[in-house]
Amino acid sequence: MITQESPARTAGSSRPSAPAPIRSESQRIAAELDRLIGVAAAGDDRAVTDIVRIVHPLVRRYCAARLGSGGNLQLTADDVAQEICLATVQAIPRYRDQGKTFLAFVYGISANKVADAFRRAGQHTAYPMADLPDQPSTSPGPEEVALAAERRHATFELMQVLTPAHREVLVMRLILGWTAAQTAEAIGTSPGVVRVMQHRALNKLRARLRENELLPETP
């Protein structure tokens, strides 16, 4: 009697073929960028355009999380995102693989550009006065605005006790809501390292809050 080979098994093999590994969205994006960067660095304009198309919404969300409303900054999140995309395009011809994903390279540029925006805000303190409205405004009044600015300043000062890498991890994990795997992909490390960095960063923030008597001691 002649039997047919089971369709779940490959020819010449007694074992079924293994299913393709499931990749996260961040892994898929990182892989797509890594595929495009070599072609883009060789001068393919379409690949460069595709990189910007993929990168822009990612860095826009990152800038919005880091800069907030940007009321006291000279640049908005959109402005900084545009700067990041421009710097990324300018860096493509000189890009060399350094053992990390191209996505991690882009987030390195993003962190530097956001830091530049904060530095410029510290150097330039002129805030333009808006025109007076004709109708009563339902927006927050001067007291609410001042309190919100004070809270933002306190948060900014608190975050300065952390290293830049730890700040990046907290922004991505707690503000952007990324998973440890997504954060690891962005900064070029492992999910386990991300969790350790987050744990240490939060412990350092708690310690500083206790020093300032803003957090009660745990029994």
List PLM regions with ranges:
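Intrinsic, short, N-terminal disordered tails of RNA polymerase sigma-factor systems
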Residues: 1-42, 46-61, 65-68, 78, ...
